[in-house]
Amino acid sequence: MNISTIVSNLKDLILEVRAPYDLEITGVSNHSSKVKKGDLFICRRGEKFDSHEIIPEVMEKGAVAVVVEREIDLDFPYIQVFDSRYFEAKVASLFFEDPWKDVLTFGVTGTNGKTTTTMMIYHMLTSLGERGSVLTTAVKRILGNSYYDDITTPDAITILSAMKENREGGGKFFALEVSSHALVQQRVEGVRFDVGIFTNISRDHLDFHGTFENYLKAKLHLFDLLKDDGVAVLNESLADAFNRKSRKITFGTSKNADYRLGNIEVSWEGTQFVLETPDGLLKVFTRAIGDFNAYNAAAAIAALHQLGYDPKDLASSLETFTGVEGRFEVVRGAKKIGLNVVVDFAHSPDALEKLLKNVRKISQGRVIVVFGAGGNSDRGKRPMMSEVASKLADVVILTTDDPRGEDPEQIMEDLIKGIDKRKPYLVLFDRREAIETALTIANRGDSVVIAGRGHERYQIIDEEKKVPFQDREVVEEIIRDKLKGRKYAQ
């Protein structure tokens, strides 16, 4: 690709070109650590950092031109654009040759259930012999090869590069979890989806979006990115908010839903329900626990059924779906000390409420919950989460989540505002101590819920400090110590 190709395809996005039209571009990058010789480097202005300031550095690393949002006082080839984030998505799609074409492409958004629904789609398709890739918060797997990072939806270049790798490797589908941040920051503007799924919406990320209306608007933008024959699959509660021309399919429990759930039963073994589809009734079982997973499964089945897959085959393949790491993840080793322990990513009032209601429903003993709140995020939801915890758990242990540079004392103060002081609660800033205390005070048959961080492998203390910490691993380590202690005591 050369500058001429870029200009001829994206001229409406460009203010000025000061670069030879025959200049060859052999790569696209947006981070100084990833620059390679021959790259077009995209400069972006963020809240804390402006990469226009490091143009000399990327020049030294081999970039042959830069994309800027303002004029630069350097003798170096550049393209000035109106919006570098939007341009990044479009030029990446151009460079990687629209890698979503001729590939079934799924985008899944919503406050809760994004990761699980996306992984259900991936699981069902691979179980049916299809080859493809998936990018979610918890799992990133390109044609069977997995890697880890803690970003829900990567940047446009990463997404489109992965899509090209998928298509060139013979992948027939690509399933992508799409956050509201990614939609606002235009990370998926270079993608077109065959199916967009909107699982549900409740309060979250208002520190970023400002209002609930803006949050909803951001989520709905996913449907603006559908292919011409694309399908919108959404929770029936969102049907009135949908005002696009695309084909709309709903799932829910009312008689008006296109895919109607009923007879939902939850146990420690999994979740079963009946799904009324346009092709008849379907009995569905998945080892993923929680009535919310019935809704996730319904959304995933609806999406694939609309593309021509047999609902019975889809339901059969879901029987082997065991769930997602850090999403109602049962720590199996806890049975050895007589407890049920659940690790979950729930970090909003609605998610925590659904989680605790499901645990309460299938538990014989008390429910003990350990959770905190992320720093530098929506403060308003903190007391709401504590109120939910006080209402649905027998014992609440407040602890640290990811402070991200915010004073943990301030976070805790916000959380305590929602606590019912008439019920047992503890405040333990050390998360490991909080988890160990929960496992120690629990009696045989009790359920311990550790919420907020799910699969995450690091605790973010501030911008400079991340410490290794995974809730499930900590639980397993404490259980091993307890079993060892019992052995020595005998």
Curated annotation (Swiss-Prot):
<keyword id="KW-0961">Cell wall biogenesis/degradation</keyword>
<comment type="pathway">
    <text>Cell wall biogenesis; peptidoglycan biosynthesis.</text>
</comment>
<dbReference type="InterPro" id="IPR036565">
    <property type="entry name" value="Mur-like_cat_sf"/>
</dbReference>
<dbReference type="GO" id="GO:0004326">
    <property type="term" value="F:tetrahydrofolylpolyglutamate synthase activity"/>
</dbReference>
<feature type="binding site">
    <location>
        <begin position="152"/>
        <end position="153"/>
    </location>
    <ligand>
        <name>UDP-N-acetyl-alpha-D-muramoyl-L-alanyl-D-glutamate</name>
    </ligand>
</feature>
<keyword id="KW-0131">Cell cycle</keyword>
<keyword id="KW-0133">Cell shape</keyword>
<keyword id="KW-0573">Peptidoglycan synthesis</keyword>
<keyword id="KW-0547">Nucleotide-binding</keyword>
<feature type="binding site">
    <location>
        <position position="32"/>
    </location>
    <ligand>
        <name>UDP-N-acetyl-alpha-D-muramoyl-L-alanyl-D-glutamate</name>
    </ligand>
</feature>
<dbReference type="InterPro" id="IPR004101">
    <property type="entry name" value="Mur_ligase_C"/>
</dbReference>
<feature type="binding site">
    <location>
        <position position="187"/>
    </location>
    <ligand>
        <name>UDP-N-acetyl-alpha-D-muramoyl-L-alanyl-D-glutamate</name>
    </ligand>
</feature>
<dbReference type="InterPro" id="IPR036615">
    <property type="entry name" value="Mur_ligase_C_dom_sf"/>
</dbReference>
<comment type="similarity">
    <text>Belongs to the MurCDEF family. MurE subfamily.</text>
</comment>
<dbReference type="InterPro" id="IPR035911">
    <property type="entry name" value="MurE/MurF_N"/>
</dbReference>
<dbReference type="GO" id="GO:0102195">
    <property type="term" value="F:UDP-N-acetylmuramoyl-L-alanyl-D-glutamate--D-lysine ligase activity"/>
</dbReference>
<keyword id="KW-0963">Cytoplasm</keyword>
<dbReference type="GO" id="GO:0005524">
    <property type="term" value="F:ATP binding"/>
</dbReference>
<dbReference type="GO" id="GO:0047482">
    <property type="term" value="F:UDP-N-acetylmuramoyl-L-alanyl-D-glutamate-L-lysine ligase activity"/>
</dbReference>
<dbReference type="InterPro" id="IPR013221">
    <property type="entry name" value="Mur_ligase_cen"/>
</dbReference>
<dbReference type="Pfam" id="PF01225">
    <property type="entry name" value="Mur_ligase"/>
</dbReference>
<feature type="binding site">
    <location>
        <position position="185"/>
    </location>
    <ligand>
        <name>UDP-N-acetyl-alpha-D-muramoyl-L-alanyl-D-glutamate</name>
    </ligand>
</feature>
<dbReference type="InterPro" id="IPR018109">
    <property type="entry name" value="Folylpolyglutamate_synth_CS"/>
</dbReference>
<dbReference type="InterPro" id="IPR005761">
    <property type="entry name" value="UDP-N-AcMur-Glu-dNH2Pim_ligase"/>
</dbReference>
<keyword id="KW-0067">ATP-binding</keyword>
<dbReference type="GO" id="GO:0005737">
    <property type="term" value="C:cytoplasm"/>
</dbReference>
<keyword id="KW-0132">Cell division</keyword>
<dbReference type="GO" id="GO:0071555">
    <property type="term" value="P:cell wall organization"/>
</dbReference>
<dbReference type="GO" id="GO:0000287">
    <property type="term" value="F:magnesium ion binding"/>
</dbReference>
<feature type="modified residue" description="N6-carboxylysine">
    <location>
        <position position="219"/>
    </location>
</feature>
<dbReference type="GO" id="GO:0008360">
    <property type="term" value="P:regulation of cell shape"/>
</dbReference>
<comment type="function">
    <text>Catalyzes the addition of both L- and D-lysine to the nucleotide precursor UDP-N-acetylmuramoyl-L-alanyl-D-glutamate (UMAG) in the biosynthesis of bacterial cell-wall peptidoglycan. Is also able to use meso-diaminopimelate as the amino acid substrate in vitro, although much less efficiently.</text>
</comment>
<dbReference type="GO" id="GO:0051301">
    <property type="term" value="P:cell division"/>
</dbReference>
<dbReference type="Pfam" id="PF02875">
    <property type="entry name" value="Mur_ligase_C"/>
</dbReference>
<dbReference type="GO" id="GO:0009252">
    <property type="term" value="P:peptidoglycan biosynthetic process"/>
</dbReference>
<keyword id="KW-0436">Ligase</keyword>
<protein>
    <recommendedName>
        <fullName>UDP-N-acetylmuramoyl-L-alanyl-D-glutamate--LD-lysine ligase</fullName>
        <ecNumber>6.3.2.37</ecNumber>
        <ecNumber>6.3.2.7</ecNumber>
    </recommendedName>
</protein>
<feature type="binding site">
    <location>
        <begin position="110"/>
        <end position="116"/>
    </location>
    <ligand>
        <name>ATP</name>
    </ligand>
</feature>
<dbReference type="Pfam" id="PF08245">
    <property type="entry name" value="Mur_ligase_M"/>
</dbReference>
<feature type="binding site">
    <location>
        <position position="179"/>
    </location>
    <ligand>
        <name>UDP-N-acetyl-alpha-D-muramoyl-L-alanyl-D-glutamate</name>
    </ligand>
</feature>
<dbReference type="InterPro" id="IPR000713">
    <property type="entry name" value="Mur_ligase_N"/>
</dbReference>
